[in-house]
């Protein structure tokens, strides 16, 4: 089946021996998503750069390590497989689309566009600006690793569909001052104010948060 990650079909292969895994991975390493409850095989997948899902059996105490860990298979659909594939190969998740916008995770190549947006007059009148470039780069590296990868949410980027222009940031985060409750935050590029983008995107994010 075709989907956004380029996965054209799903084939399930039962692997009983490590040799069979190596033979399969050598032929189609970018076309495999591996699922196992065996940490040794999951480690093999990591070593040959194959996306892996760990099945954590409910009765076991040992915690498995992989790109994703599941305790059941109800959530393992094509969207879930796409997320695993993208996370493994550092492809930013597209969170949602609205009529005019695409909301997706930040990747490091977005940094120049982010600095350009924050340089617009009035952009930081009511919020903090960015760090110096190198410090911001390190901050975003840590954010991608610790927020996106661990929690699966955070502050995302907002792009105008028609032009591909970065027009803002929006997302949800836990706030300690709110007793750990979720807070919706957003910032729209100054030159795109008063066009309904904030309302459009925030409504979609609230709906997304309720569903997931």
Please provide the spans of the model-predicted regions.
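Conserved acyl-CoA
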Residues: 7-8, 24-28, 191, 198-212
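Glycine-centered helix-boundary capping/hinge motifs
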Residues: 49, 152, 194-196
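GNAT-family acyltransferases
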Residues: 68-191, 203-208, 212
């Amino acid at each position: 089946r075709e989907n956004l990650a380029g996965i054209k079909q799903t084939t399930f292969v039962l692997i009983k021996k490590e040799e069979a895994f190596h033979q399969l991975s050598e032929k189609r390493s970018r076309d495999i998503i591996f699922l196992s409850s065996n940490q040794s095989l999951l480690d093999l997948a990591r070593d040959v750069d194959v996306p892996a899902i760990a099945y954590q059996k409910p009765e076991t105490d040992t915690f498995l390590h992989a790109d994703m860990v599941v305790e059941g298979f109800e959530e393992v659909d094509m969207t879930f497989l796409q997320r695993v594939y993208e996370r493994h190969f550092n492809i930013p998740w597209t969170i949602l689309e609205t009529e005019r916008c695409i909301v997706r995770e930040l990747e490091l190549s977005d940094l120049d566009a982010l600095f350009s947006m924050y340089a617009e007059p009035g952009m930081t009148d009511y919020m903090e600006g960015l760090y110096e470039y190198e410090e911001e780069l390190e901050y975003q590296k840590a954010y991608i690793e610790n927020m996106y990868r661990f929690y699966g949410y955070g502050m995302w980027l907002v792009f105008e569909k028609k032009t591909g222009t970065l027009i803002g940031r929006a997302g949800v985060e836990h706030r300690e001052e709110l007793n750990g409750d979720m807070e919706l935050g957003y910032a729209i590029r100054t030159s795109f104010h008063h066009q309904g983008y904030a309302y459009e995107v925030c409504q979609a994010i609230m709906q997304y948060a309720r569903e997931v």
